[in-house]
Amino acid sequence: MTESEWDDCEDAISMLEFVFDQLEIRSDSTQHKFGYRLNSGSVAPDSQFETTMHRFHLAVCRKIWPLLPDDETQKGVAVAEKWLDGDVPSSALNDCDYYVEGAAFGIDYKSSPDELNRWISTIDAIPESELRAMLHPQFTERPDSYELLKSAAYFAHYAIMYPAMNPKGLPPDSYHQFLSADLLRVHMRYAA
């Protein structure tokens, strides 16, 4: 990928594949697992690249904020941002993991139907142009609001706990719809 192609690219996954190739990092999509924990002594990701990736994932969460209506998920994003800035210990990130994971499970298993229906109605009411701005351009049809809500919740968990995941690779396919090439360019510069 040339710098001009990087600047014009609308596919964050293609861009990430290029970066991973340049850094000689396996770019296989990771499987989103649960139960990750950071070591209590760690206060920052292992590398500048991991820090950049974590910030990018959290920025994506902010971009899709209307798709993340659960308070615990929003708190988790805020804690992860503070963790990256060195303002809270790893234990704080580990503590919020349980609640963020639980929020995603609650949506997935429809454990609070009234609340879930309110959230779905809120997403249904998002104007088409606003929703399009949150999603990858390849998605031409409006996604099902429940599926979007569920995927966004699981993506937020992935984004928050990204530093604890090993191995790291491309996000799982179901999260690609949220990744923004423009936002990636804000966090990562072209490097040949």
Segments predicted by a language model, with ranges:
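Structured binding/interaction patches within domain cores
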Residues: 1-192
